[in-house]
Design a protein with these regions (language model features):
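Second-shell loop/turn segments in exported
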Residues: 2-9, 27-30, 44-52, 112-115, ...
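Stable alpha-helical elements in mature extracytoplasmic
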Residues: 11-16, 23, 40, 44, ...
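Conserved PDZ fold ligand-binding element
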Residues: 19, 116-138, 226-228, 338, ...
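Sec-exported extracytoplasmic/periplasmic mature domains
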Residues: 20-32, 42-53, 62-73, 126-132, ...
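Extended, small/polar residue-biased N-terminal targeting/export presequences
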Residues: 31-104, 148, 157-183, 419
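PDZ/PDZ-like domain segments forming the peptide/carboxylate-binding groove
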Residues: 82-137, 208
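Cleft-lining beta-strand/loop regions that shape enzyme active-site pockets
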Residues: 146-148, 152-364, 418
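Low-complexity, Gly/Ser/Thr/Pro-rich intrinsically disordered linker/tail segments
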Residues: 390-419
Length: 419
């Protein structure tokens, strides 16, 4: 299916009906589907059913979903081969007044191993155009998967340059993204380790958990640790390993509760919820995990994440987390866990405030709806959706300094650990 194909009227009506039914059955917060939502559906129905192309249909349905003002909502066709900068290039950006070039998107996080980094795009570079089209806010750039795009950017020398960015095809249909280098470890200063985690792929996260543990072992007997979660937009339960590396014991982290549990006294019930407290070392043991949690799948009980009890580390008590406006979902789970349990000092910008459990569902004719199915609560009862986590030390992204190679946020982290 091409993006310019027209859809039969009955197809559009059927897909919209399925979208609304799926939201009614699975959406985590049913109170948001009341009169205001029904009015929005009535208002948008005409433009959705009159959408002339597949691309326009996706856009109109997405406009309707945006009225719910909730993260983790999305609508796309399974054959779609275009994605955002974050998903396609492994890079994030922010709106900035650049002076000479006006209001533009400026790259903030550029993950190693991603398409943007391979094309030598750097944090602080200004995006001017994509494939011959001028791109400026509020329009967001999108990139075709499995193809090469030509980007015009401005770097630290203030000169325009054209770079070719080749985006790999995604691994599956459910989530359109390309993995960057997931874990990077180094020693930026004497006795200080640095661990950057770009994302937490996988539902259980066996591979990412092993990679983080190996990186910590390779850092050796460090006396302080910087964990860089800037630009980490989340993932799965592999984040539990990172939390476990911040403390020696077993500490309850939190849980996600779907709409079935929304009206219940979770503070009184949470002690009875089953606990996920160990990531298997090998994927071949995942079936044992599935067997263990089979009753939970039947009862749909929330599952409490609990740290794995990995023992004392030489850097415990001297940890700094680097976060920014793009730190979201499972990465925010790590951040609030460290903050509430006084396991790390948080440096950088307020996080995204997007922390829900989510899934995607087929809604007919090749389309899928991504939607949040549960609210996440920390063990202390904090719900983060819509509430960014404030850093202990605010250090804003300074784009002009950053493109000159000065990372003030990292420098602040090193300063705190050297005290």
């Amino acid at each position: 299916m091409t993006k310019t194909n027209t859809l039969l009227p009955e197809v559009k009506r059927d897909v919209l009906k399925n979208v609304l039914k799926t939201l009614e059955n699975k959406f985590y917060k049913p109170e948001l589907l009341g009169a205001t939502w029904q009015d929005a559906v009535s208002t948008h129905r005409g433009s959705i059913e009159d959408a002339p192309t597949t691309d326009a249909f996706e856009s109109e349905v997405s406009n309707l979903l945006q009225t719910l003002k909730t993260s983790h909502l999305g609508f796309f066709h399974g054959d779609a081969r275009r994605a955002s900068s974050r998903a396609a290039l492994s890079a994030t950006y922010l709106l900035t007044d650049t002076g000479t070039h006006g209001q533009r998107w400026v790259f903030q996080d550029v993950h190693e191993g991603g398409a943007a980094a391979t094309a030598r795009i750097k944090p602080g570079d200004i995006l001017l155009a994509v494939d011959g089209r001028d791109i400026a806010p509020p329009e967001h750039p999108v990139f075709p998967m499995g193809k090469t795009s030509e980007l015009v950017v401005v770097g630290s020398d203030s000169a325009k340059r054209t770079v070719s960015v080749t985006v790999a095809r995604p691994k599956g249909k459910k989530l359109q993204y390309v993995e960057p280098t997931l874990v990077i470890a180094k020693t930026p200063a004497l006795n200080i380790g640095y661990l950057k985690v770009a994302m937490f792929p996988g539902m259980v996260g066996v591979d990412i958990a092993n990679a983080m543990s190996a990186a910590i072992r390779d850092l050796g007997a460090i006396k302080g640790l910087i964990v860089d979660l800037r630009g980490n937009t989340g993932g799965g339960a592999g984040s539990l390993r990172l939390m476990s590396l911040l403390t020696d014991g077993k500490i309850p982290v939190g849980f996600a509760a779907d709409k079935k549990w929304a009206e219940k006294d979770l503070s009184g019930l949470k002690g009875s919820f089953p606990r996920f407290d160990s990531i298997p070392e090998k994927s071949q043991f995942l079936w044992l995990l599935a067997l263990r949690f089979l009753p939970t799948l039947i009862t749909k009980s929330p599952v409490v994440l609990e740290t794995e009890g990995l023992g004392a580390k030489p850097y415990h008590g001297r940890v700094v987390l680097l976060v920014n406006r793009h730190t979201a979902s499972a990465a925010e789970m790590v951040t609030i866990f460290a903050k509430e349990n006084h396991l790390a000092t948080i440096v950088g910008e307020p996080t995204a405030g997007r922390l829900l459990s989510a899934t995607s569902a087929k809604v007919g004719h090749g389309f899928r709806l991504a939607l949040p199915t549960g609210a996440y609560y920390t063990w202390n009862g904090t719900a983060l959706e819509g509430s960014p986590i404030e850093p202990d030390y605010l250090e804003e992204f300074a784009w002009e300094e950053r493109r000159d190679g000065v990372d003030a946020q990292l420098a602040k982290a090193i300063e705190l650990l050297n005290v």
